[in-house]
C-alpha cells in the first residue's frame, strides 16, 4: 500500500510520540525500595494493578495504596506520584510539529493505553510546548476512558465505530 492510499494515521503515545526511559522508571522505583527481587515476586500483582489502573477500573487512590505496600516504610503517595511522572517521559517538540504537518494531509488519531493522571500531565506538557491536543489530533482514544486496552480487538473496533475510519486506508 502506498502512502497515496492512506487517509488516516493512528499513533500510540508512549514510546512513539513521547520517549519513555524504562531504566529511569526502574531506578525511580528502586529509590522507593521496590527492588528487582520485589518486582519479580510481585510481578503478577503489579501487572494486575497497572492493567486495572491504566484501564480506569480502579481509582488512583486505590492504586497508590497498593503500590505503597510494595515500597519501603516511610514512602508517601507523593513519592509514588513523582515516580509515576517518570512515565510521562520526554516529549520532543519536533514530534508535535510533525503531527501538525501530518494533519494537513491525513486524519490523525491517538490511541493509547494510559491512565487519567499521566494523560493530564502529558496534556500540560504539550501546552508548555505550545500545543493543544486539538491541534495535534482529530480525536484522542485513551484506554482509561474507554475501559478497554490495546491490543484487544474491542478497542480498535470502538475507535473504528466512533470515527468511521476505513481500516484498509489506515496506518
Regions found by a protein language model. Name each.
Residues 2-5, 104-105, 163-167:
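Glycine-rich phosphate-binding loop signature in dinucleotide/nucleotide-binding domains
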Residues 4-93, 104, 115-121:
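N-terminal helical cap/lid subdomain that shapes the substrate entry/recognition surface
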Residues 8, 149-171:
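Conserved Lys-Pro-Asp/Glu-containing loop-to-beta segment of HAD-superfamily phosphomonoesterases
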Residues 26, 96-100, 156:
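Short amphipathic alpha-helical segments and helix-helix/interface helices
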Residues 38, 134-139, 167-170:
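Short acidic capping loops at alpha-helix termini that bridge into adjacent secondary structure
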Residues 73-75, 130-135, 164:
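Short helix-capping segments at alpha-helix termini
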Residues 94-141:
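Substrate-recognition/cap helix-loop segment adjacent to the acidic, metal-dependent catalytic center
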Residues 145-147:
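Short, acidic/glycine-rich phosphate-metal binding loop used to engage nucleotide
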Amino acid at each position: 500500500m502506498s502512502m497515496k492510499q492512506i487517509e488516516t494515521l493512528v499513533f500510540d503515545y508512549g514510546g512513539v510520540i513521547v520517549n519513555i526511559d524504562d531504566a529511569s522508571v526502574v531506578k525511580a522505583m528502586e529509590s522507593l525500595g521496590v527492588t528487582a527481587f520485589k518486582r519479580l515476586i510481585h510481578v503478577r500483582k503489579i501487572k494486575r494493578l497497572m492493567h486495572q489502573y491504566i484501564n480506569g477500573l480502579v481509582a488512583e487512590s486505590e492504586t497508590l495504596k497498593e503500590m505503597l505496600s510494595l515500597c519501603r516504610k516511610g514512602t508517601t503517595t507523593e513519592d509514588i506520584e513523582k515516580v509515576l511522572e517518570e512515565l510521562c517521559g520526554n516529549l520532543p517538540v519536533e514530534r508535535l510539529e510533525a503531527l501538525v504537518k501530518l494533519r494537513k494531509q491525513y486524519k490523525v488519531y491517538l490511541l493509547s493505553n494510559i491512565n487519567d493522571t499521566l494523560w493530564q500531565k502529558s496534556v500540560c506538557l504539550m501546552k508548555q510546548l505550545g500545543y493543544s491536543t486539538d491541534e495535534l489530533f482529530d480525536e484522542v482514544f485513551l484506554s482509561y476512558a474507554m475501559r478497554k486496552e490495546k491490543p484487544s480487538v474491542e478497542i480498535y473496533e470502538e475507535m473504528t465505530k466512533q470515527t468511521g475510519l476505513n481500516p484498509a486506508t489506515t496506518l
